[in-house]
Amino acid sequence: MEYSSLTLDDFLSRFQLLRPQINRETLNHRQAAVLIPIVRRPQPGLLLTQRSIHLRKHAGQVAFPGGAVDDTDTSVIAAALREAEEEVAIPPSSVEVIGVLPPVDSVTGYQVTPVVGIIPPDLPYHASEDEVSAVFEMPLAQALHLGRYHPLDIYRRGDSHRVWLSWYEHYFVWGMTAGIIRELALQIGVKP
């Protein structure tokens, strides 16, 4: 498949046909979730944020909207939708959730569940000034091109940990965000 011409219908068909196996073992027990917002267009986009430089953790990094599951959340999906509304003003009612990817462990001790959702193209995004410094859209076909990601092995506390690095325009996409995008690409059958 030529991913430069990936349509929303192609993406949805491939995601639904190749359902994720979510029984993956994780080390962390604290729950968090992120929303992977796919912008509904003939050539879909991937909505990303750049975190505020004033945050204590992951300052200035490119990320999906998301955060810890709290006591008011009924599920990880509810947490992802709540965080997306808090961070970039995406109303939960405007998100068509199509599924989740397997949870991943974060270096900060969370088990993070990526929630994949389709959002309308005309939403007036409004970044929460406390948490987000920028909101931008990357063409989904470009985001899912595995050749754009480069591995880097980091050693932490005696263990090797592989992270992925990439650039989009002037944004440095790496770490968990790049790993989740790669997982989404692999999930729909993109070959390395």
Swiss-Prot record:
One Pfam short name: NUDIX
Hydrolase is among the record's keywords: yes
Nudix hydrolase domain sequence ranges: 29-160
Gene Ontology biological process terms from the UniProt entry: nucleoside diphosphate metabolic process
Keywords: Hydrolase, Magnesium, Manganese, Metal-binding
InterPro entries hit by this protein: CoAse, NUDIX_hydrolase-like_dom_sf, NUDIX_hydrolase_dom, NUDIX_hydrolase_NudL_CS, Nudix_NudL
PROSITE patterns noted in UniProt: NUDIX, NUDIX_COA
Motif Nudix box: where in chain: 67-89
Residues reported in the UniProt entry to bind Mg(2+): 83, 87
GO molecular function annotation: coenzyme A diphosphatase activity; magnesium ion binding; manganese ion binding
EC number, as in UniProt: 3.6.1.-
Family classification: Belongs to the Nudix hydrolase family. PCD1 subfamily.
HAMAP family with a match to the protein in the record: Nudix_NudL
Function: Probably mediates the hydrolysis of some nucleoside diphosphate derivatives.
NCBIfam families: PRK10707.1
Protein name as it appears in the record: Uncharacterized Nudix hydrolase NudL
